[in-house]
Amino acid sequence: MSVDVHSDFNPSRCSTLIELLEARAALHPEKVVFTFLPDGEEAGITVTYGELSTRAKAIANRFGEHTQVGDRALMLFPSGLEFIFAFFGCMYAGLIAVPAYPPRRNQNLGRLKSIIDGLGEVIATY
């Protein structure tokens, strides 16, 4: 995964989201890539390209201790930045991310069980 980063950088030269993130993090580490809107309107926490790359790599390293490239990762996250970090962490680690909302306390677990049954062997993240 190597992208030639220079002033005439062309994103179409990147073949993966990770290559694109790495290029953007190298060119514009302080530029905001995500802003979380906790109430749907007011800007809350922001994340820069550099922060996203750093956090995702740290997560990928932890995944790498327990997984192999191509493993499936069931991602049980509510909406938010933690999901974004884990999703990119999966990509850095070569895992197949399978996002799903965590079940509510009063919710039937049938939907989640169906997802897990369809995946076979899987790791769960939350």
Predicted regions and their residues:
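Acyl-group handling in specialized metabolite and lipid biosynthesis
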Residues: 5-13, 39-45
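A short N-terminal helical cap/helix-turn-helix that marks the beginning
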Residues: 11-35, 54
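Conserved AMP-binding/adenylate-forming core of the ANL superfamily
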Residues: 30-67, 71-88, 104-113
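Anion (oxyanion) recognition and catalysis
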Residues: 91
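Structured binding elements
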Residues: 94
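Conserved ATP-dependent adenylate/AMP-binding module captured primarily in the ANL superfamily
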Residues: 99-126
